[in-house]
Amino acid sequence: MGWIPALVILGLSSVAAAADDPIVEKLEHGEVNWTTKTVVATGSGAPNLKLENVAAVRLNAERAAKVDAYRNVLEALKGVKITAGEPGSKALENAQVRAQVQGILRGCKTVDTRYYSDGGVDVVVRCALDGGLATTLSPVKSYKKVKMDGEAKYTGLIIDAVGTTAKPALKPRVLDDKGEPVYEAAMVGPSVLRQRGTASYARTVDEAKQNQLVGKSPLVVKASALGEVASDIQISGEDAAALRNVNQTFLAEARVVIVTDGP
């Protein structure tokens, strides 16, 4: 089996391991499930009673509801944190980025359709944050080489940030005690970044350990503080050194889970 299909399978199994109590951030026009890395929004379509028959009225209302749902996803994305100091709204000010995102949203999955006796329709759509959306909203301009020689001591990284009020984001960073990056999106391979993003999120360390993403031998570290923005997590100098001095293949593959109290 090639490595790209393997990534797809791993991504699916990671989602399957999500907790019953997902990390959900409520936004004005929708919500983000940071456990499954998806954004969900609902659209409504009113009936056009001037149409010739019931089927035409329903179809027209369903189409209108879907367009409204896409519009609400776009609005919801404005509130999604790329980093805690960089909301999606900033990226979407760019007309080209906004047009690209609108095109990607056409591929969102309809997860529920509700029909009403008056002919109105509600449509619920769900879109994956990782992949095209994340890389379009915040492309990595340059990549950093990571240490890939030596013994592969760890299969993943779990950062216990419970109690630090760390905020989920598309591009969180892990910093040392001096504020220098130990892990960031620029260290992740481009194809991996598109496949599953920079990091996943969990509510407990036990839940994180059950995520197949981090493998059987993850390094577990405790966050000591937050950086200048709440999606940047600081770890001790000792833990940072441990990360820098080992084979970092697991970082290049974004095998990272951040444990947090939630948004």
Role assignments for model-derived ranges:
Residues 1-4:
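Bacterial N-terminal signal peptides that target proteins for export
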Residues 9-10:
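Compositionally biased, low-complexity segments
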Residues 13-14:
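N-terminal signal peptide c-region/cleavage motif recognized by signal peptidases
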Residues 18-263:
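Domain-level marker for long, solvent-exposed, non-transmembrane regions
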